[in-house]
Amino acid sequence: PTEIEPFGGAATCLGGAIRDPLSGRTYVYQAMRITGAADPTKPLNQTLKGKLPQRKIVTEAAHGYSSYGNQIGLATGYVKELYHPGYVAKRMEIGAVMAAAPRKNVIRETSDPGDVIILLGGRTGRDGIGGATGSSKVHTEASIEVCGAEVQKGNAPTERKIQRMFRRPEVSRLIKKCNDFGAGGVSVAIGELADGLLIDLDKVPKKYAGLDGTELAISESQERMAVVVDPKDVDTFLGYAKEENLEAVTVATVTESPRLVLTWRGKTIVDLSRAFLDTNGAHQETDVTLEVPNHEGTPFEKKEVGDVKEKWLKMLGSLNVCSQKGLVEMFDSSIGASTV
């Protein structure tokens, strides 16, 4: 995603990293960012066809990640960018977070027939459709022009509200199971919560009109959570969401029949057995040949150093040893330090 739309791709890198532990009801306290790029000082005319210039990717991605982290109020304690020609084909964008919560506040139970599933947070749009497959498929020179919609659009303030809400013990203890909306959207985030499900796509809040059932089912719009609660706790949970100015609606129920059923405009558009879904697709095998590592020319091999001054100056001229102070200072590393 960062190769195609650097700002949004890097922002959702951090947003997704925060949502993963958040679905486990843990609060994220710290983040780190390690990236890899080719030489951003290369002239524009040396850019590979069908790719953005490295300088554009490097600067916009840093803006995207830091913008999301600074808005949500997450301390980014370590930032490092590595430069190597191997990253000219595909950039490396790694975001990692550290999260924790009191064990007594985290409830993990099975979904029972009759339980209600609430969709919490952001609205659903066309952004992110195909993002899961897009990050793994083979891209071509045309990807930069036609795959922009696969990149999700983050909304840090909304995710901050979910963080604040889930941090409250009285809220966290109402949640039996929870999934964040990542790859696959409604069909996966809700589809994984129980063996039998009846999902009403008409109830899914939309960013705008015109979305069909397929788009509602697979959109990967950001800042959404699927929460399983007992029927008697639904009104209480919706009340807590309203206090945080979060949109929350009931969109599905757990059923006894082990089937995933999605309805749209009064019609059933998906009806799949859980046994089929649990096969995870066709069984695949492949043959692998491992090559023995070449021990010659390794970084640990002792070499004769000729002109020490020349080697020293060459090393100092490397992008990997230059100061990254300007990059690091884009990220707030102390936010929350004085919060009790």
Spans of model-derived segments:
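Glycine/proline-enriched, intrinsically flexible loops and inter-domain linkers
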Residues: 1-340
